[in-house]
Amino acid sequence: MTNIPVYLYPQEYAAENGELDKYRLSRKLNLACKEAIEQAIGAHYSENRLDTSAAVKQVADAFGYERTLYVLAITVQHKGHDGRISDANKDWAMSVPIFEDRIDGSADNNRFLVVDKVNPGLVDLFVRGTRRAQAQEKEQQAERAKSKTAEKPSILEKLKRPVQRNSPNNSANFLEPEL
């Protein structure tokens, strides 16, 4: 499920552009992700403490960070009035482009993606934990990519090296004739 991209556009756009299948699949996964977030928070909340890293890992492993953060951005945007959501998370959520998903003036269909079966304070912790985990994963990926490129010389470096001619004078197996 993590390899299926989030479809960002509203249903009306998808219908006009022949992409309803992509829209429907993405929406189905978004709803499942929302439910998984609610379930993970409930499962990892005990004795007034949320095991944020375990809850985030459970959802991110199943749906990926892109979809998880998309659903969380919708949630925070819809709960912008709630004081239990931090200003930092509200600012982040407002920076994520979310299209309204209305058909013929109806209410925004994104309201069905709002994580609302758990306390907003716990949602705030989950959002912060997810953003942090994604940043750490990006750092690790960058370090792995950097170490891979450090191990292998670039093709440009290979091309800059002087050419070694393959001649008898340079050959290790060349024996000078005895005189």
Question: Which residues fall in each region the model found?
Answer:
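Gram-negative host-targeted secretion-system effectors, predominantly Type III and Type IV
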Residues: 1-178
